[in-house]
Amino acid sequence: MDVVSSARRGPRQGDVWLVALDPTRGSAIRKTRPCLVVSPDEMNQHIATVIVVPLTTTVRAYPTRIGIHFRGKTGQAALDRIRTVDKARLVKKLGGVPEAAADEVAGVLVEMFTRG
């Protein structure tokens, strides 16, 4: 399936979308940038928002940052900057990450949100 037809079906977990993150406040990651969709597909199909993790080329040695290689660039998925955005902020689908990278992101999210 090409990017145009897959964009019509809406965001899916593991997709990378260009997302208009502004306006922001405080130290939130700003501007329009690639973001990894982490919300489950069933949720993405039925509600007007999607949970995303911004991708950044600014590398930090945080346990909440996962190395991602996307479109010839190496960077990180900034799980410490996770946010929910309205689908109206989704500009266009850029592609997706390999399943192994999506699994690693999901594993760290489970660790982040497990009480203990």
Task: Pin down the residues of each PLM region.
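Conserved functional hotspots at enzyme active or ligand-binding sites that engage polyanionic ligands
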Residues: 1-116
